[in-house]
Amino acid sequence: MGQVLPLVTRQGDRIAIVSGLRTPFARQATAFHGIPAVDLGKMVVGELLARTEIPAEVIEQLVFGQVVQMPEAPNIAREIVLGTGMNVHTDAYSVSRACATSFQAVANVAESLMAGTIRAGIAGGADSSSVLPIGVSKKLARVLVDVNKARTMSQRLKLFSRLRLRDLMPVPPAVAEYSTGLRMGDTAEQMAKTYGITREQQDALAHRSHQRAAQAWSEGKLKEEVMTAFIPPYKQPLVEDNNIRGNSSLADYAKLRPAFDRKHGTVTAANSTPLTDGAAAVILMTESRAKELGLVPLGYLRSYAFTAIDVWQDMLLGPAWSTPLALERAGLTMGDLTLIDMHEAFAAQTLANIQLLGSERFARDVLGRAHATGEVDESKFNVLGGSIAYGHPFAATGARMITQTLHELRRRGGGFGLVTACAAGGLGAAMVLEAE
């Protein structure tokens, strides 16, 4: 085993996660239609502070992220500070690491705590797939810049005359990798073919995710960590996630056609996570600061790791790469874990990562390690369902997973939990959490 890297301050304090909260997650263009990510972020941070009754001056830093950037609010973190009644002097900056954005926000706040520059901070993320930055074509954009500099009407008209009808069409945000042109679903199809993952296996995992999430809601396990959202025109509150299919049967999944490889594919809308709106945040403190304030932590951040691989083939292997590093830094093995929560971008991606975590060949030939990371115990894995069921507001998912895992660890009497995710650009993230 490699070097253990304890996450403690210079005074020996552990990094405590004292509270976490999220909005309900809503499918694109449903309950949060028209609500921008910055407002979702304000909503969850404001409610989190109200529930914990932590004085505004205690929070010294807010690190927040969004993946679908809005030009009018490029620093979402600072807008949240200014829009929630927090101390105006609170440091705030924004981060983006695709689907691992709130993992990065948590790591940044943890590093500030370890450096001693702060003693308490908030980390999180928000995204809206319903309020999108619809752009213009490159040709129209260039003409508009030139028109702004033109001195006469004739010069302006001459510039506009260069445009064709197709140049006036709106341009939606890109859904493909900038460097490869591949969509996430294309990569999921690659992984299904590379690792021999069948349509039936993918549908079974998706069905399991929805069944577990529906059960978690029906048993009241999520009520404490999901706020009620009141949205214009304030006629009906949103209380629960609206993507979960609690009454579906496995046979229903087989009816859908492939979404990406139309002829030979196995990835469908049902075994993939949907476009989603929502926000989530956690409060982190040094252990001693939490004690000063009389707060009982949900748990502690034991370790974290970020990795990056090539983007051309099977790039959503972040969990298989980052998990062994995070476990190594925590001084733990897979067998020591009480819970494992893996982001389900696609069922194919999830099953491929599970397969590789237990692969001796992958460990030896690809990671350069002597042994496999370890088999994933199904009884510990995504026990409350995952992103396929809950949805995936890109920047919020990590904070959801952290909060959800810590609450479940406490219900089980404590232990260690792994949260891990893949992300666009071949990125991966993993964190080990501890609850007492």
Swiss-Prot record:
InterPro entries: Ac-CoA_C-AcTrfase_FadI, Thiolase, Thiolase-like, Thiolase_acyl_enz_int_AS, Thiolase_AS, Thiolase_C, Thiolase_CS, Thiolase_N. The active site is at C99, H392, C422. GO terms for molecular function: acetyl-CoA C-acyltransferase activity. Its EC number is 2.3.1.16. The keyword Cytoplasm applies. SUPFAM superfamilies: Thiolase-like (SSF53901). It is an enzyme of class 2 (transferase). It is found in: Cytoplasm. One of its GO terms (biological process) is fatty acid beta-oxidation. GO terms for cellular component: cytosol. Pathway: Lipid metabolism; fatty acid beta-oxidation. Keywords: Acyltransferase, Cytoplasm, Fatty acid metabolism, Lipid degradation, Lipid metabolism, Transferase. Gene3D superfamilies: 3.40.47.10. The keyword Transmembrane does not apply. It catalyses: an acyl-CoA + acetyl-CoA = a 3-oxoacyl-CoA + CoA. Catalyzes the final step of fatty acid oxidation in which acetyl-CoA is released and the CoA ester of a fatty acid two carbons shorter is formed. Belongs to the thiolase-like superfamily. Thiolase family. Heterotetramer of two alpha chains (FadJ) and two beta chains (FadI). This is 3-ketoacyl-CoA thiolase. It comes from Escherichia coli O1:K1 / APEC. The gene is fadI.
